[in-house]
């Protein structure tokens, strides 16, 4: 069979002008001239029917007339093999097993074997050709597309040759914007609108040289943007946010289309599309394929596509097909020959089947059908299929194409391509640059987008600024009107420190934002939109006005309320220093986020970093008192330079009088300044009752001469971290596609290995769909006998559902009716937005908002109390506890949802029945995990169904889109399971997204909805859809002979074939509608006259609350036990903070200065809370989302059990954290080591672990999402820290706050108990510099001169030399209790009093978790007659 390789699909259909030398399959050289390039009309395309085809041709002709060279490449690859580290099953360590060092060391020596994910692939896609790559998940389709898109990072080994035109893969790297891949994920900034997203993409791809007749770059961009939006039918979404799971925006299908047109905006020459029709209905998917076909034909693109569930209409638009199985290429050749080739091997393509599904199903025993006479000789697995293909004539024909890159034609096309790209690029760019617009324009466009992102998420921005203003007012009132004497020194220093601290804490959000935007940036980098440096500079440019505003609204209230120096120069110096420090700290955290691969690592480091920088600012530990082993931190700390400059700016040139306990002696009779001196104030000079600001600064090793030096150093640090950010951002890489790997919990490893060993022994040479069965597995009939039979009839009538929107009430369901009987498999279908999921949610009582009218009945009676747990509901999203194994998830559901009268053993036995039914034996002991690290999409779907089945649903089972995102075989498997359930008497109602004809035929009845939830058909489907076909044919829309009836119906009702006809009215006027309503009334009355099929036990939950709590708590404890990342991060935070704190405050003595150091050492313990809460909250909210999404709605267990489980699961680790912090911190600080004191401190630390956990959990319990929680944390923790009596002592707190918030603050009692136990009994020994030294008057002795003072104001002072007549030395305090008295801690019993109050606060914080969770739990809506 000789096939000419330059035909109507081999070369572009326009501008064929050069001579070309190519071999045909007989290896003879054929020279083709311009006119003989094709035997067909080059202007004819299989996509000529596409509405925008004329526009594509017009654009192409305009470019040709403008003298533009064509950008045609083609892709050829040979002997392409890819290896990855084999990760078929990774072991998930638990908290204890991770410390089994000998075992881990033994296992680490066994290097994981390499797995070939793509094996010796070959092919050629010339300009103007489309290749369809088919294969089941894990067969290597995505890997092949990544290789052809020249994205090789993350793979262990890549061998073989890939050529782009005549270029090698290395040469093609500089043209990465012309060889692009659209991945399966939709990665966007959700707060941008569709229009803004497309503005950004199109602006960065406007060519330098414009076609004739185009007025400006903006006109070109606007025209292209309009064309792209029209091409996918989403022009109406231009002002709608893209959105995501948290931010409401366009629908899932529309978001996928935005992803498609953003990729098309690159104007590339080679496109790789990875499952780009996922989430689109068949009509839209076909339109997309036609669009790609049209552009490929006219523009000479090379298009490679991989699809799941491709209909025949889509399949027929391709030129070539490549089929992969286990990485092996079992077919590559013309699309028209693929089906005949497979049929010649003995496989049968069922009538009405999708050919694409047939091609991928030939190696799956449960899917394939063998032609009579071929049973003994058909190829049974991938190796046998490959062997057959290697011998075939198809391969022999295709080999001739592999010379294409060396042909004269390819070389000329490649030269034209290079010239065209050079003309498109801005002249300022270097020749090797992959970008289109120059660097300055990239920055401008990125700055515009940054502001759009901010404006799009106004709520977060406003919350941030309002909380800044609130915090500024609180801080200003806390440090209000600080006096200009020694009493105000500490208060003013605190206010200046807080000015830097708060803005630095806000800057920590940069770490989170870095990871939120990273996937989008990596995608845009692969599209060659902009250089990462442009993105980083744009972020900074966008920061400046925002931070100016933020710093201003913080600085103004704080500065003037505190009463800092009323001098314009001093104020503006303060403002610019706070701004410069904030910019530097923003750069620090942005660099920290950019430098790490995972958020866990970045958050761990940033949390530790902020602690270190705060501690070494110079506020807690003064510069002269820092230990030499950590003093280097001071020199690299931007906060330290800022704090030095702020204090120098404020106190320079001032005279600071000493007052109160800082002045010795003081009071009546001691007015002579020459016999007074200052104590407890740095820089004091004997015999002087004041301190100069510059002496005070010198005592801290500060100087006013450093102010502008430090300002310069701050900007130097800023510049350094910006450079680090740019370098780190430039090195960001996308994750490699290694395929999902199973996770085996350590405690199940042996069982899994034994299971795998049995599998290997029983394995035959034929690949099976199931690797093994559970012990004592029963055959199909035994399983069927054990399944629960349903005898109840479920009906709904005149169902309407209305929701309130800003524009008024909106009706989503309009008088819908229907029924599901036992043994019936019902399909619920309709186009996107028709209300399929809404109807299921209403029927299953899952709605908590809106108004529902109509009747929903079981056996003609109102829904029983137990309905939500008696009916199974498999939602579209597979929501599961990731750290549970499959068996545990099923057992959890069975134990909680089967009736309380059923023995436990019987419930667990039924789990085995369902595991056998759903063929889950080989994954029963693996963790569910998350998508990509755990079960595959199809396996997760089966687990979702299993979780509902084990509950023995006695009424019916709802399933929402169970086949969405699955390949054809997995979808067929899923529906086959559902058919099996219906056959044994279950009632099943399923929403399904465009099934193949084969799947459609499995259903018994159909409810078809149009936009607005209007019914257009309800009734039997008939044999192979005959009844439905007959209905539509009778009303003027006959189904073509080979068309899929399911696709045809959607097209007729709401797609290209609707022709504006109102099918809802057609239905209402039909006899089928009248008969269905009569039948419904008959079913209801008949069912109501009989005893109910389901007996209501009257319980909302199947199990009593106590048993619910035990089962839920056990699961939650096991999940935390296995979540080593979370536990290790918590422990590392405590150990790291404790060691750092302990060594920073090493062996403190008993001087007055060291008393203050002890205060700060204990105060620092409070700061483990922000880091620990930041780790705890996402986990709490993730579990709450699982509970809200599925477990609450199915009445599995009460919210009380949920909260109890979460609280109890944390307790063992909180005890461990307290032990580790205490041991690593306490004994190196010089605090009392006696068991009564140390034991009391440990007990208080243990209570604090519970206190901050309770605070973190009650914020999480009510927060709508994790972002809100992270914005709330600083306000709550910041307020508690501010008013606990440390930053401002009790006596100096303003009266407004002092009499309520101080006493309601748990941190006040925490610090009170810790200080009392550690300082109360200490004898104070002043250092030489701390004494007040002066000469008594008239030669009197010190004791005689000071006797009145020591009995009055100086009662706590300690006179060292009472008999001396000169140089009297007075220490400010005698014992620790004297110092604590100034902090409102008046007796030792205050320690235990405060401990008891902290314990009450712990209980109160946990009570708040229950209370706020109860407040958040809404009741489901019921239908109103």
From Swiss-Prot:
Coiled-coil spans in chain: none
A cellular component annotation (GO) from this entry: plasma membrane
Phenotype of null mutants: Leads to increased sensitivity to different classes of agricultural fungicides: cyprodinil (anilinopyrimidine), ketoconazole, prochloraz and propiconazole (azoles), carbendazim (a benzimidazole), fenpiclonil and fludioxonil (phenylpyrroles), fluazinam (a phenylpyridianine), azoxystrobin, kresoxim-methyl and trifloxystrobin (strobirulins), 4-nitroquinoline oxide (a mutagenic agent), camptothecin (a plant alkaloid) and the phytoalexin resveratrol (a stilbene).
Keywords, ordered alphabetically: ATP-binding, Cell membrane, Glycoprotein, Membrane, Nucleotide-binding, Repeat, Transmembrane, Transmembrane helix, Transport
Chain intervals with Polar residues compositional bias: 27-43
Domain ABC transporter: 96-351, 788-1037
Binding residues for ATP: 830-837
Signal peptide residues on this chain, from the entry's feature table: none
Entry keyword annotation includes tRNA processing: no
Gene3D superfamilies registered for this protein in UniProt: P-loop containing nucleotide triphosphate hydrolases
Entry's localization field: Cell membrane
Entry-linked Pfam families: ABC2_membrane (PF01061), ABC2_membrane_7 (PF19055), ABC_tran (PF00005), ABC_trans_N (PF14510), PDR_CDR (PF06422)
Transmembrane portions of the chain: 489-509, 520-540, 569-589, 601-621, 628-648, 710-730, 1161-1181, 1205-1225, 1239-1259, 1267-1287, 1300-1320, 1395-1415
Induction info: Expression is strongly increased in the presence of cycloheximide, imazalil, fenarimol, pisatin, itraconazole and 4-nitroquinoline oxide (4-NQO).
Catalytic activity field: cycloheximide(in) + ATP + H2O = cycloheximide(out) + ADP + phosphate + H(+); chloramphenicol(in) + ATP + H2O = chloramphenicol(out) + ADP + phosphate + H(+)
Biased composition (Basic and acidic residues): 747-761
UniProt-listed PROSITE patterns: ABC_TRANSPORTER_1, ABC_TRANSPORTER_2
SMART domains (alphabetical): AAA (SM00382)
Gene Ontology molecular function, alphabetical: ABC-type transporter activity; ATP binding; ATP hydrolysis activity
Family: Belongs to the ABC transporter superfamily. ABCG family. PDR (TC 3.A.1.205) subfamily.
Role noted for this protein: Pleiotropic ABC efflux transporter involved in the basal level of drugs susceptibility, including antibiotics, azole fungicides and plant defense toxins. Confers resistance to cycloheximide, chloramphenicol, imazalil, sulfomethuron methyl, pyrimethanil, quintozene, acriflavine, rhodamine 6G, the azoles fenarimol and miconazole, and to the dicarboximides iprodione and vinchlozolin.
Protein name (record): ABC multidrug transporter atrB
Native source organism of the sequence: Emericella nidulans (strain FGSC A4 / ATCC 38163 / CBS 112.46 / NRRL 194 / M139)
């Amino acid at each position: 069979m000789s096939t000419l390789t330059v035909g109507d699909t081999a070369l572009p259909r326009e501008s064929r002008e050069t001579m070309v030398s190519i071999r045909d399959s007989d290896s003879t050289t054929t020279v083709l001239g311009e006119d003989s390039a094709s035997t067909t009309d080059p202007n004819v395309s299989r996509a000529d029917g596409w509405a925008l085809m004329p526009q594509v041709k017009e654009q192409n002709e305009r470019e040709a007339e403008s003298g533009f060279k064509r950008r045609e490449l083609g892709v050829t690859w040979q002997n392409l093999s890819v290896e990855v580290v084999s990760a078929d099953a990774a072991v998930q360590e638990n908290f204890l097993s991770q410390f089994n060092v000998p075992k881990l060391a033994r296992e680490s020596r066994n290097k994981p074997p390499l797995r070939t994910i793509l094996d010796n692939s070959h092919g050629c896609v010339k300009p103007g050709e489309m290749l369809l790559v088919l294969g089941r998940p894990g067969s290597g389709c995505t890997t092949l597309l990544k290789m052809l898109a020249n994205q090789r990072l993350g793979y262990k080994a890549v061998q073989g040759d890939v050529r782009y035109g005549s270029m090698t893969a290395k040469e093609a790297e500089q043209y990465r914007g012309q060889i692009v891949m659209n991945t399966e994920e939709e990665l966007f900034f959700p707060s941008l609108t569709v229009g803004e997203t497309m503005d950004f993409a199109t602006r960065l791809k406007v060519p330098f040289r414009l076609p004739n007749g185009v007025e400006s770059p903006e006109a070109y961009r606007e025209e292209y943007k309009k064309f792209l939006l029209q091409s996918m039918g989403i022009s109406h979404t231009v002002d709608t946010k893209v959105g995501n799971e948290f931010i409401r925006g366009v629908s899932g299908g529309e978001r996928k289309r935005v992803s498609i047109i953003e990729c098309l905006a690159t104007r590339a020459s080679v496109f790789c599309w990875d499952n780009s029709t996922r989430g689109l209905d068949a009509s839209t998917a076909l339109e997309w394929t036609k669009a790609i076909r049209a552009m490929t034909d006219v523009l000479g693109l090379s298009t490679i596509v991989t699809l799941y569930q491709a209909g025949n209409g889509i399949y027929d638009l391709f030129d070539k097909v490549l089929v992969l199985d286990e990485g092996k290429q079992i077919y590559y050749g013309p699309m028209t020959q693929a089906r005949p080739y497979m049929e010649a091997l003995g496989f049968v393509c069922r009538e009405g089947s999708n050919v694409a599904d047939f091609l991928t199903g030939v190696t799956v025993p449960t899917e394939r059908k063998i032609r009579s006479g071929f049973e003994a000789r058909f190829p049974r697995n991938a190796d046998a299929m490959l062997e057959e293909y290697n011998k075939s004539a198809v391969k022999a024909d295709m080999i001739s194409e592999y010379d294409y890159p060396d042909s004269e034609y390819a070389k000329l096309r490649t030269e034209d391509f290079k010239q065209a790209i050079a003309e498109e690029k801005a002249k300022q760019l270097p020749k090797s640059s992959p970008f289109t617009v120059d660097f300055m324009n990239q920055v401008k466009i990125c700055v515009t987008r940054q502001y759009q992102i901010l404006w799009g998420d106004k709520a977060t921005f406003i919350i941030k600024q309002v909380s800044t203003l609130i915090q500024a007012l609180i801080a200003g009132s806390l440090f209000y009107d600080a006096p200009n004497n020694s009493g105000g020194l500490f208060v003013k220093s605190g206010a200046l420190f807080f000015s830097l601290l708060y803005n630095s804490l806000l800057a920590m959000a940069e770490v989170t934002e870095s990871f939120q935007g990273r996937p989008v940036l990596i995608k845009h980098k692969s599209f060659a939109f902009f250089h990462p440096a442009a993105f980083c500079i744009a972020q900074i440019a966008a920061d400046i006005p925002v931070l100016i505003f933020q710093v201003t609204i913080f600085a103004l209230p704080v500065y003037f309320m505190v009463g800092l120096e009323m001098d314009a120069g001093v104020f503006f110096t303060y403002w610019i220093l706070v701004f410069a420090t904030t910019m530097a700290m923003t750069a620090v955290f942005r660099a920290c986020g950019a430098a790490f691969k995972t958020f866990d690592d970045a958050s761990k480091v940033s949390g530790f970093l902020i602690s270190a920088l705060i501690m070494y600012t110079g506020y807690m530990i003064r510069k002269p008192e820092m230990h030499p082993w950590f003093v280097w931190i001071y020199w690299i700390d931007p906060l330290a330079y800022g704090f030095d400059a702020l204090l120098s700016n404020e106190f320079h040139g001032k005279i600071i009088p000493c007052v109160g306990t800082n002045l010795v002696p003081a009071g009546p009779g001691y007015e002579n300044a020459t016999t007074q001196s200052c104590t407890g104030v740095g820089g004091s000079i004997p015999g002087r009752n004041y301190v100069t600001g510059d002496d005070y600064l010198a005592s801290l090793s500060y100087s006013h001469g450093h102010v502008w030096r430090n300002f310069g150093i701050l900007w130097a640090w800023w510049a350094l971290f910006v450079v680090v950010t740019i370098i780190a951002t430039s090195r960001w890489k996308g994750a490699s596609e290694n395929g999902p790997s199973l996770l085996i919990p350590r405690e199940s490893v042996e069982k899994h290995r034994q299971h795998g060993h049995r599998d290997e022994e029983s394995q035959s040479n034929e690949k099976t769909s199931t690797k093994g069965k559970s012990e004592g597995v029963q055959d199909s009939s035994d399983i069927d006998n054990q399944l629960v039979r349903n005898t109840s009839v479920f009906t709904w009538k005149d169902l309407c559902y209305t929701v309130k929107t800003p524009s008024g009430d909106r009706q989503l369901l309009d008088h819908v009716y229907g029924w599901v009987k036992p043994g019936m498999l019902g399909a619920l279908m309709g186009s996107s937005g028709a209300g399929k999921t809404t109807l299921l949610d209403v029927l299953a009582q899952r709605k908590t908002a809106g108004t529902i009218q109509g009747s929903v009945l079981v056996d003609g009676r109102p829904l029983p109390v137990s309905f939500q747990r008696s009916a199974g509901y498999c939602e579209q999203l597979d929501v599961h506890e990731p750290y549970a194994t499959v068996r545990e998830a099923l057992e959890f559901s069975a134990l909680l949802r089967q009736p309380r009268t059923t023995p436990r053993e019987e419930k667990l036995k039924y789990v085995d029945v369902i595991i056998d039914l759903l063929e889950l034996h080989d994954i029963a002991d693996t963790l569910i995990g998350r998508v990509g690290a755990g079960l595959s999409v199809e396996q997760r779907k089966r687990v979702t169904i299993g979780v509902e089945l084990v509950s023995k649903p006695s009424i019916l089972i709802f399933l929402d889109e169970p086949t969405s995102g699955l390949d054809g075989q997995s979808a067929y498997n899923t529906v086959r399971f559902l058919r099996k359930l219906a056959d044994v008497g279950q009632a099943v109602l399923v929403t399904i997204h465009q099934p193949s004809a084969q799947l459609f035929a499995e259903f018994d009845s159909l409810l078809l909805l149009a936009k607005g939830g209007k019914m257009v058909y309800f009734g039997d489907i008939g044999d192979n859809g005959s009844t439905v076909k007959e209905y539509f044919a009778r009303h003027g829309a006959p189904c073509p002979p080979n068309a899929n009836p399911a696709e045809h119906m959607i097209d007729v009702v709401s797609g290209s074939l609707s022709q504006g006809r109102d099918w809802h009215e057609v239905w209402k006027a039909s006899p089928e509608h009248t008969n269905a309503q009569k039948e419904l009334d008959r079913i209801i009355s008949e069912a109501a006259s009989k005893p109910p099929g389901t007996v209501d036990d009257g319980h909302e939950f199947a199990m009593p609350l106590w048993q619910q709590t035990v089962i839920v708590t056990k699961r939650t404890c096991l999940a935390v036990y296995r979540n080593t990342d979370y536990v290790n991060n918590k422990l590392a935070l405590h150990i790291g903070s404790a060691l750092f704190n302990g060594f920073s405050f090493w062996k403190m003595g008993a001087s007055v200065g060291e008393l203050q150091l002890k205060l700060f050492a204990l105060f620092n313990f409070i700061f483990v809370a922000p880091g620990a809460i930041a780790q705890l909250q996402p986990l709490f909210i993730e579990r709450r989302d699982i509970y809200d999404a599925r477990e609450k709605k199915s009445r599995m267990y009460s919210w009380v059990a949920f909260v109890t489980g979460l609280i109890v699961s944390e307790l063992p680790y909180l005890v461990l954290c307290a032990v580790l912090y205490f041991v690593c911190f306490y004994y190196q600080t010089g605090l009392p080591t006696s068991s009564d004191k140390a034991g009391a401190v440990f007990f208080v630390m243990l209570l604090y672990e519970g206190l901050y956990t309770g605070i973190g959990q009650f914020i999480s319990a009510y927060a709508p999402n994790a972002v809100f929680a992270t914005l709330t944390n600083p306000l709550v923790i910041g307020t508690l820290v501010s008013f606990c009596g440390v930053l401002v002592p009790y006596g100096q707190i303003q009266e407004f706050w002092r009499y309520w918030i101080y006493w309601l603050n748990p941190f006040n009692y925490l610090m009170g108990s810790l200080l009392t136990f550690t300082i109360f009994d200490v004898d104070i020994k002043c250092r030489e510099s701390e004494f007040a030294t002066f000469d008594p008057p008239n030669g009197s002795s010190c004791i005689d001169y000071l006797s009145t003072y020591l009995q009055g104001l100086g009662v706590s002072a300690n006179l060292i030399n009472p008999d001396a007549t000169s140089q009297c030395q007075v220490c400010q305090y005698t014992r620790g209790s004297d110092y604590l008295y100034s902090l409102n801690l008046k007796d030792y019993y205050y320690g235990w009093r405060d401990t008891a109050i902290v314990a009450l606060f712990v209980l109160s914080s946990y009570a708040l978790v229950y209370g706020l969770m109860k407040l958040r739990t809404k009741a489901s809506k019921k239908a109103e007659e």
